[in-house]
């Protein structure tokens, strides 16, 4: 594809400590603010690509732990994705690149485990709800956004709703 994925990284001082905000570590239980990314926004607006014209802000499911049942966690995640969608739109990006790969070091977003305190059926319903909230937040900021993913279809197929077949599959809750 004739495009490029751009990772946005910013940092600021909070209570005497340097805190970093990175688009590939977007699943955080903290609501990011637009002004945190002012420098990146200005830089991206200044770009005038002639050859690489389909550019995407890179995101990743890598930062855990994830909690499907925490309303505050998902409000923050949706806020952060809406913010990245807004920045993508305002800076002429085509959209967001979603890295959904199962990195073993952080706990995977779409994994099901009975340890989460819910049945597979309840967890799947909650994941669907969170998916709707997520896409609504993104769509509100950038209605005609392009979402690009490396593994979108291959993660979901083949899937089974038979809990005995799921085990610890990393994509059991993938919508």
Question: What function would you assign to each model-found segment?
Answer:
Residues 1-175:
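Glycan-processing catalytic domains of CAZymes
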